[in-house]
Amino acid sequence: MLYALWCTDKKDSLQLRLDTRPPHVEWLNGLNAEGKLKFAGPTLNAEGKPMGSLVVIVADDAASAAALAAQDPYAKAGLFETVEIRPFNWVFNNPEA
């Protein structure tokens, strides 16, 4: 099943995001190689600066999705104010549909 990880950064944490980006990208590449990543990218504020992340992953259940989310270097660094994990139904433009 697909799960959306909707992550919101803590206020004034752009530098932490930038500093932690290389291991975060490495983590995403690992998920991709394992077939667990569907898509990912930053959410942006009105000025076009990153303020969070949207990551859609494959997991057996919500607990497995939460365990994967906890492995994100951004999460480990304390970047996120909140992380919402929700089942996701990719209807339009799904290349596997």
Show which residues each predicted segment covers.
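Conserved, structured core segments of small domains
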Residues: 1-97
